[in-house]
């Protein structure tokens, strides 16, 4: 069991097959848990009807994926607009919302370009803008830097920190120690169970990354013993 408090930035780590993506899919209402409960904002997501799931997902959750999931036939601006269009938001309000977040994500100068005209790091920042434009209760990120080079990954992770510092709750699955070190807490899972968790506290990223490495070594030792 674990909980995510409002305003937290949590990274989830574990070996391939440990259940990281399954966990994210259950929280995202894409899969249903075979046992237990998942509460988001006081609602048990497993109890939602099919008609309720779509609106809940649209209003309460934001998603950032490894492969960006942007539509090349839409401008970056229109890609960001998409969840607002689905919620029947007026164009003038959409413009205001994009105007608020574009400077924060440093994408103002690429809004009218298309995804194929910008870099991978810029694409991911557009994807983040699309994910947070509705001000979701929870932002879910699945390996958000997996398709990026080191420099672009650093920029994207600093972007996550910026939006988290503004109050956005973030839950991120990653295999990267460097990326996990940007989070305020790291949860380690194996076979669908929480094995360990560590808090960043006042540590800098380098110190926290070393603690994450040490935790992984410890857990791998447990795994080898079990095998």
Regions found by a protein language model. Give the residues of each.
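The feature captures the beta-strand-to-loop junction immediately N-terminal to the Walker
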Residues: 13-15
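Helix-to-loop junction immediately C-terminal to a conserved catalytic motif
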Residues: 28
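Short coil-to-helix segment of the ABC ATPase nucleotide-binding domain corresponding to the Q-loop/switch region
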Residues: 74-82
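A short, proline-enriched helix->beta-strand linker immediately N-terminal to the Walker B motif
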Residues: 133-137
């Amino acid at each position: 069991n674990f909980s995510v408090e409002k305003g937290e930035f949590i990274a989830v780590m574990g070996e391939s097959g440990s259940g990281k993506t399954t966990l994210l899919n259950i929280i995202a209402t894409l899969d249903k848990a075979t046992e237990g409960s998942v509460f988001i904002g006081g609602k048990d997501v497993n109890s939602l009807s099919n008609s309720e799931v779509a609106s809940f997902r649209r209003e309460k959750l934001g998603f950032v994926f490894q492969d960006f999931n942007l539509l090349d036939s839409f401008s970056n601006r229109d890609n960001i607009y998409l969840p607002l269009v689905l919620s029947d938001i007026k164009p003038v309000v959409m413009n205001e919302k994009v105007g608020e977040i574009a400077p924060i994500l440093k994408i103002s100068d690429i809004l009218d370009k298309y995804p194929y005209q910008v870099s991978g790091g810029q694409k991911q920042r557009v994807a983040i803008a699309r994910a947070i434009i509705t001000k979701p209760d929870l932002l879910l990120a699945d390996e958000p830097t997996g398709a990026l080079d080191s420099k672009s990954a650093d920029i994207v992770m600093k972007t996550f920190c910026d939006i988290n510092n503004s109050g956005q709750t973030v839950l991120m699955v990653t295999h990267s120690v460097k990326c996990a070190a940007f989070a305020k807490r790291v949860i380690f899972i194996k076979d669908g169970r929480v094995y360990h968790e560590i808090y960043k506290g006042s540590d800098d990223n380098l110190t926290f990354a070393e603690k994450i490495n040490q935790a992984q070594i410890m857990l791998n030792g447990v795994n080898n013993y079990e095998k």
